[in-house]
Design a protein with these regions (language model features):
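Conserved, well-ordered active-site substructure
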Residues: 442-460, 464-468, 593, 600-666, ...
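N-terminal secretory signal peptides that target proteins for export/translocation
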Residues: 1-39
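Loop/turn positions that initiate beta-strands
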Residues: 570-579
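Short alpha-helix capping/helix-loop boundary micro-motifs
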Residues: 556-569
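Zymogen propeptides
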Residues: 61-68, 202-238, 287-291, 304, ...
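Signal-peptide-cleaved, periplasmic/extracellular N-terminal interaction regions immediately downstream
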Residues: 57-384, 414
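Short, Lys/Arg- and Gly-enriched loop/turn segments at beta-strand edges
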Residues: 365-368, 581-593
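Bacterial N-terminal signal peptides
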Residues: 47-58
Length: 706
């Protein structure tokens, strides 16, 4: 009878305006009841009774009556439709419902979310680093990756349980949301979260010895976001700024902002300096107004017309502050010195949002994010200067953690650039940092990349590199790759580059790892094709001809630049073989290598010699945001982004070497820095607003398997 009822109900009301559970749920109920009939001891009578009640409620509940079906883009679908998944797996112990978007009070944010069943109760989790950006929830220090204390208009820090996937750490907001009166509805891959309406009761401001403070009084806790908007246009100068890497072509285009990706080809990208938040220096003595930058703090709170008309004044470092209304949100627009960031936090009893404008903006953190993976933020002092440093400390010997080079397009292509956010998302990593140098014009790597024992890009210019394996062994040193072609006649020809976009006179070798084809970098190149260790073809290549040459899968090609005499030793039909070794020799046993430079620390001592790695003198003295990687005495890996000193510019190479040394690195390497610097964890950049980060070619990713 029960089975008849289950199968009859859908047919009986097929043409009515009553919502039914999904076909999968009907199938699940049928199977459970069939098990009861066949084996009553397997399924309890109480479960059968509960299932019957569920059927009645799901069919005849007033909430099941269909409204006019809106389109997928309709706000009513996002805000009103309740589509909970009661599948068997959801009521188990593992993730089922997942998505990457939340609609927060009607505004869409990219926030990973997940639902799982725990003891028969559905729990909702939001990605921790994204929740911080979307709602202003501050993550406090913890040594337990499974419990995360937070600060959000709290007198005492609530502790949220967490669960980990290979990419995200979810904070279980189920109980917290209920206490705060949040409403959660799931619609496909979007979680709709509605918080109680809030209002602003007052706005106060005051000058401080260290800067300025703005206080916004609220009648209840409410979500808030902070966003870097822009800096004013810079005046034209006769001498353009030097590139991040002087080895990059002088005619290269600057890295575009992420917004420029949507522009049609041929449009000019905006110039993005090494560090968009770097303090600007006056261009000449006539400069009166120092450069500023604009930030917006948006609150999901309404403000009265009277309070909106309140005039707010500039302060010590607060150049201007304005309030406007956008829908149900209130925006606080501030202009502050270039290189500064607002420090924003919340207080309870009464509820307040505090905006501090001060040179030392960093909120220090020490969070065990996962077993073997620690996220830290703190100031490192060098004399009177204090540098904000963001870093991950990774134990490569921890089960479930692996380190790999990551790329924009590989294995489809070795070239291409995009944001580290996109590279990390595509690679499905938990953490990452930008890594090696690259050519901005052809978007090819300039330095060592070894992946699974294959050279995707060979070392250049005696520059530093890091090597590692899955046993947790790490080695950092200056690296050279020495290859020799041995001809059938016994001649030895030196190969100066392997799979490299660094064009030098001599012989370069290009293997299938470079791609299916090779396009000449210069005119009058001699192309020698080797298949199965035998010379099979000679060709001449020129850039003007735009010709490409196939790289055989069973061999490689040799490119002779300004060395025509070598062709006489490579006779068609003759046999050749290649000898290859690294210096230091032990690098050859490591399957993974990424190049950077300069080499900073060895045996806990600073060994910086940028000249030996062919960095020019001007570049050596430059200050900029820095990316780096190091090894501690315990064998852990430090993945580091060092930003502008409080009230000043970023570190020089020498200062960065000292920073790495003070952090406990016994070996350390500088990576591509400036606008390229990006440190990623759990779906977001930790160290900078994402729109200020430039496109990069490659990175180093931390893969995590719980």
């Amino acid at each position: 009878m029960l089975l008849i009822t289950i199968y009859a109900i859908p047919d009986a009301i097929h043409n009515t305006n009553i919502n039914l559970p999904s076909p999968k749920i009907w199938e699940m109920l049928s199977k459970i009841l069939l098990n009861y009939i066949i084996s009553p001891g397997f399924v309890s009578p109480l479960m059968v009774f509960s299932l019957c009640a569920m059927i009645v409620l799901s069919v005849f509940s007033p909430h099941s009556v269909k409204a006019d079906t809106p389109t997928d883009n309709s706000p009513s679908l996002i805000n009103n439709k309740q589509n909970f998944d009661f599948s068997p797996s959801l009521l188990g112990q593992k993730n089922t419902n997942i998505g990457d978007k939340i609609s927060l009070n009607g505004r869409l944010f990219y926030v990973p979310w997940s639902q799982r069943g725990i003891n028969g109760v559905i729990h909702t989790g939001l990605g921790d680093t994204s929740l911080r950006l979307a709602m202003g929830v501050d993550l406090l220090n913890t040594t337990n990756p499974h419990q995360q204390p937070i600060e959000w208009f709290s007198s005492e820090a609530p502790i949220l349980n967490t669960w980990l996937t290979g990419i995200y750490r979810y904070l279980d907001i189920t109980d917290f949301a209920q206490k705060k009166g949040w409403k959660i509805v799931i619609n496909r891959d979007t979680l709709t979260l509605t918080t109680p309406s809030a209002g602003i009761s007052n706005i106060r401001q005051g000058k401080q010895s260290w800067g300025d403070r703005v206080i916004i009084d609220l009648d209840r806790p409410t979500p808030w976001q902070i966003k870097y908007i822009s800096e004013p246009p810079k005046p034209k100068v006769p001498h353009p700024p030097k590139p991040d890497d002087p080895t990059k072509p002088q005619g290269s285009q600057p890295k575009p902002l992420l917004d420029d990706l949507t522009k049609p080809q041929g449009s000019q990208p905006k110039t993005l300096p090494d560090d968009p938040t770097k303090p600007g220096k006056p261009q000449d003595k006539t400069t009166v107004t120092p450069p500023t930058q604009e930030w917006h703090i948006t609150l999901d709170a309404q403000i009265s017309p009277t309070l909106l008309q309140q005039k707010l004044s500039a302060g010590n470092q607060l150049k201007s502050v304005n309030i406007d209304v956008a829908g149900k949100q209130t925006r606080v627009k501030i202009n502050i010195p270039l290189g500064w960031r607002p420090q924003v936090f919340t207080l309870a009893n009464p509820n307040r949002l505090v905006i501090d404008i001060r040179p030392d903006f960093l909120l220090e953190r020490n969070i065990t994010w996962a077993p073997g993976l620690q996220w830290q933020q703190r100031y490192i002092s060098l004399g009177k200067d204090r540098f904000p440093v963001f870093f991950l400390e990774v134990n490569l010997r921890q089960r479930g953690i692996k380190l790999r080079p990551i790329f924009t397009n590989y294995p489809q292509s070795i070239n291409g650039t995009t944001s580290l956010l996109k590279i990390a998302d595509k690679s499905q990593v938990a953490g990452a940092i930008n890594a090696g140098f690259f050519n901005r014009v052809n978007q090819l790597s300039l330095g060592a990349i070894r992946f699974d024992n294959r050279w995707l890009s060979g070392p250049i210019l005696n520059r530093g590199a890091i090597a590692w394996n899955d046993d947790g062994d790490i080695r950092i040193a200056r690296l050279n790759l020495q290859e020799t072609m041995i001809t059938q006649g016994g001649s030895r020809l030196s190969v100066i580059r392997v799979n490299s976009a660094d064009v030098q006179d001599g012989i370069s070798r290009y293997t299938p790892e470079w791609g299916e084809n090779y396009t000449p970098f210069s005119d009058d190149e001699l192309i020698v094709t080797i298949e199965k260790d035998k010379v099979t073809r000679h060709n001449t290549g020129n850039t003007k001809d735009k010709m490409t040459f196939s790289i055989p899968k069973n061999g490689y090609i040799l490119v002779l630049r300004s060395l025509p005499s070598a062709i006489e030793q490579l006779v068609i039909g003759s046999n050749v073989r290649v000898e290859s070794e690294t210096n230091p020799p032990e690098f050859n046993r490591f399957p993974y290598i990424v190049g950077g430079g300069p080499f900073l620390v060895q045996n806990s001592q600073v060994v910086l010699d940028a000249k030996a790695e062919n960095f020019n003198a001007v570049y050596q003295r430059q200050t900029a945001i820095r990316s780096g990687i190091g090894k501690t005495v315990s064998g852990n890996l430090l993945i580091v982004a060092a930003h502008n000193r409080a009230g000043g510019s970023g570190p020089t190479f020498a200062e960065f070497a000292q920073i790495m040394q003070k952090m406990g690195a016994i070996e350390a390497l500088n990576l591509d820095g400036g606008s390229s610097t990006s440190l990623y964890l759990g779906g977001e950049l930790l160290d900078r607003p994402s729109q200020t980060a430039a496109r990069v070619h490659n990175g180093i990713g931390v893969f995590f398997q719980p």
